[in-house]
Swiss-Prot record:
Single GO biological process annotation from the record: translation
GO MF annotation: an example: RNA binding
Record-stated family: Belongs to the universal ribosomal protein uS9 family.
The protein's name: Small ribosomal subunit protein uS9
Domain of life according to the entry: Bacteria
Coiled-coil segments on the chain, per record: none
Entry-linked Pfam families: Ribosomal_S9 (PF00380)
InterPro entries: Ribosomal_Su5_D2-typ_SF (IPR020568), Ribosomal_uS9 (IPR000754), Ribosomal_uS9_bac/plastid (IPR023035), Ribosomal_uS9_CS (IPR020574), Ribsml_uS5_D2-typ_fold_subgr (IPR014721)
A GO CC term assigned to this protein in UniProt: cytosolic small ribosomal subunit
Keywords: Ribonucleoprotein, Ribosomal protein
Alphabetized PANTHER family for the sequence: RIBOSOMAL PROTEIN S9, SMALL RIBOSOMAL SUBUNIT PROTEIN US9M
Length: 128
């Protein structure tokens, strides 16, 4: 099987996922994903597309991810892996879509407005 690639995005994170048949290693920016993502919820999030379609341990996945924080990066990788699995077998699309793993989360950080402390929070108001 040749190398398949897919892109996942979340907030400002962009993950380029390269999937090929192998023993099941997931490498993120040159590190094992369990070293890169230290908390268990993030590790489970990254592995969830593979576990859902029972393909864990069948593919070697190499990921280049940049931008954002760890949660955004983990969710970008999750989307990229799900998209790559659909390229392998189109039958995976419906269970992945049903679990919401094929949908790009389009929520972005709202910009800060002038005259306010943050995007919506106002400066302290003094009545007297």
């Amino acid at each position: 099987m040749e190398v398949l690639n897919a892109i996942g995005r979340r907030k400002t994170s962009v993950a380029r996922v390269y999937l090929q048949s192998g023993k099941g290693s997931i490498v993120v920016n040159g590190l094992d994903f369990k070293t890169y993502f230290k908390t268990e919820p993030l590790q489970i999030s990254v592995e969830s597309p593979l576990n859902l379609v029972a393909e864990a341990g069948k593919y070697d996945i190499n990921v280049n991810v940049q931008g954002g924080g760890v949660t955004g990066q983990a969710e970008a990788i999750r989307l990229g892996i799900a998209r790559a699995l659909v390229l392998v077998n189109s039958e995976f699309k419906s269970p992945l879509r049903k679990e919401g793993l094929m949908t790009r989360d389009s929520r972005m950080v709202e910009r800060k407005k002038y005259g306010k402390r943050k995007a919506r929070k106002r400066f302290q108001f003094s009545k007297r």
